[in-house]
Amino acid sequence: YDPPNLTFPFGAYLCVVDVDKFTGEVKVRRFYALDDCGTRINPMVIEGQIHGGLTEAFAVAMGQQIPFDENGNHLGNSLMDYFLPTAVETPKWETDHTVTLCPHHPLGAKGVAESPHVGGIPCFSNAVIDAFAHLGVTHMDMPHSAWRVWKQCNALGVNKR
């Protein structure tokens, strides 16, 4: 089935992180994004959409959590307890693009913000897990907050002085 309105963007993402084994802090050293949204009608708007999608992916992977107790009661008090990255926490994005025209759109355009958001989350997560791969770690639950990463370091015994 090939409906006339089917369009989808795609991208590829690469993330390099440093993990402080004593504090659990994760610093994104480098993040590279290559996106394809078809015809680039307004490059400045596209860049903003990519930055926004990546920033939300960063927030989801690295800190956003809505905690509940065993009875399902929400434990957060306000958005002060919810990670909303500012320009201070947000990494510098290195972006590039390729163009594959969409045959179902008169201009060949596609969506843009979906790819960096959906692809960015596992990219951040895999970068953190990769930092522990030499110790046999193949999975870590998100978000990768400093507390969770510190607990992982502690469980592995790598943060002993």
Residue ranges and their predicted role:
Residues 1-161:
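C-terminal catalytic domains of large/alpha subunits in multi-subunit enzymes
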